[in-house]
């Protein structure tokens, strides 16, 4: 009997190909056209997206990307490639492909790469620790569309999330302890997660609970008193209410009330990107310091650290 050959598909959000208005516009158009991300009726959304949002946001966002762009491309792409290569090095007999929901390399190119390696079974690991319909759900949807076009469909194991997985929590805790050793223990450790519209949660998305699960387990692992840890949500977009409290408003409040030393971690980001390196490490630092805060440090994402790769090995092991 032929032994099953398994491949691993690491999935993440995606990134523009270049820090230019044209490349950013292409990326944002694909991203903001996904109903999992924005579910506004199309007759209302298309004119707003194409006539207002893309022309206005693309040049501004391109400048932000230019401020963080690396020699190998966008940080998200650089670190994602490093993750793929590190995991592949640990699993020499298992093909590992990288696919993005938006931009390049696409999820379809990743599936094709694995099928070309003659795999019978694909383990899909969306690198979103906390499930949300707007992230993990988008990977699920696109995977279904891709496979619907294939004559040969492999077996699929889909890892929904890993918000309270012990290897993930241990990796976060080690990263936080290293930051504490470098900068001193902060007055407040702020855990900033990407926000979603409150309406999504009201309609059944359990993302807020999965963020709370991560926060609870991380606080326990670090042995910090609850009053020294805060959970907030960043990157809100549009006018409808998003999950609260908002990260920027919380940092302003903490600075104004005299909190001296803040360290910020973004547990929901598996790789550093625009939202961490520019929004959190730069914009929100300024907000806190201008409000009266004294010391601010951003704790990097897990990226391709050995502990993060160990976690990926553990999560995929039952399916390999």
From Swiss-Prot:
Fe cation binds at residues 194, 275. SUPFAM superfamilies: Chelatase. Keywords: Cytoplasm, Heme biosynthesis, Iron, Lyase, Metal-binding, Porphyrin biosynthesis. Transmembrane segments: none annotated. One of its GO terms (biological process) is heme biosynthetic process. It comes from the Bacteria. Pathway: Porphyrin-containing compound metabolism; protoheme biosynthesis; protoheme from protoporphyrin-IX: step 1/1. InterPro entries: Ferrochelatase, Ferrochelatase_AS, Ferrochelatase_C, Ferrochelatase_N. Its EC number is 4.98.1.1. Monomer. Catalyzes the ferrous insertion into protoporphyrin IX. This is Ferrochelatase. It comes from Salmonella paratyphi B (strain ATCC BAA-1250 / SPB7). The gene is hemH.
